[in-house]
Amino acid sequence: MKVILRNNVATLGDAGEVVAVKNGYANNFLIPQGMAIRATEGTLKALETEKKQQTKKIELQRKHAREHAQTIEQMSLKVYAKAGDSGKLFGTVTSADIADALKAQGIDIDRRKITIEAPIKSLGKYEADAKIFQDITVKVHFEVEAEGSEA
């Protein structure tokens, strides 16, 4: 029997794939558990239209991500942190601080998608990588300044 997988099944394949399985496995396990549906003409057509819509949606999201990437590349962020007279920070600048600075500029990126190569413990100019889509990573340029120097 041919079925369309609704979820990823380790032994069979990924969601959306059409696979051939034994009748008993499909009728007694996959279909009742909601892991698959029967592959009929109607469901196959529905699957194709859903895949086309999904592809269009992903392309639109990728286009918006590229636009965001260009905006972020040109941006110059300022991150404020407590610092001593010598320019050494009390603590470190984290990805959460960079995410907050981006949010203040109107760009919302999850802090877990921002990576800093080395701990930032002094004032100065730095770069971080931000993954804004599946395959689009952008360099975020920012400057760490002492908290009292805000204008």
From Swiss-Prot:
GO MF, one annotated term: rRNA binding
Keywords in alphabetical order: Ribonucleoprotein, Ribosomal protein, RNA-binding, rRNA-binding
KW DNA repair (keyword) present: no
GO CC entries: ribonucleoprotein complex; ribosome
PROSITE patterns, alphabetized: RIBOSOMAL_L9
InterPro entries recorded: Ribosomal_bL9 (IPR000244), Ribosomal_bL9/RNase_H1_N (IPR009027), Ribosomal_bL9_bac/chp (IPR020594), Ribosomal_bL9_C (IPR020069), Ribosomal_bL9_C_sf (IPR036791), Ribosomal_bL9_N (IPR020070), Ribosomal_bL9_N_sf (IPR036935)
GO biological process: translation
SUPFAM superfamilies: L9 N-domain-like, Ribosomal protein L9 C-domain
Domain of life from the UniProt record: Bacteria
Family of this protein: Belongs to the bacterial ribosomal protein bL9 family.
Function text: Binds to the 23S rRNA.
Protein name: Large ribosomal subunit protein bL9
